[in-house]
Amino acid sequence: MPKKATEVTSPHISQITDYLYISAFPRGEHVAEIVALGVRLVLSMHWMRPTKMLGAPPVTLLWLPTFDFILLPMPIRTLNKGVLAALLAIREGGSVLVHCKSGVHRSVAQAACVLIGMGYTADDAMQLIKEKRAVADPEARHIQSRIRKFAKQWPEVKDS
């Protein structure tokens, strides 16, 4: 396995923890850096299908198309699916990159849910993301409500 890069060089990618990154919509030119960071799973929250290059081994791509629209909430089942896949990748020693169009709302919601799956509270997850990614807006009403709803139902999902 190639040696993991020690720092992010792309301004589009923010490292949240040792195992979690958030970015805007990555392009083909970002694939080498994503692989070098040890990313083994990309969770794509954009409604447009991402480049197939993002899913080339050793990386797996999980496309979870969602919309950033206050009247069309992100489905909790979609967030659950992303978290379950992320936890598996993390347990296997890989990192996870979550992206949407701008890396502000949908990716932030999914990343917060991954952190909750790892044991963070909703408040701690949102705070950490805000500290690590300046453009992140987990407090947008339609995003925060999804994070909190996910946190409330997660104990039942993880135990099932």
Where are these regions (language model features)?
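N-terminal carbohydrate-binding accessory modules
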Residues: M1-P2
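Cysteine-based protein phosphatase catalytic domain of the PTP/DSP
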Residues: A5-S95, I116-R148, W154
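A phosphate-binding catalytic loop at a beta-strand-loop-alpha-helix junction
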Residues: G93-A112
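C-terminal domain-closing interface element
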Residues: K152-S160
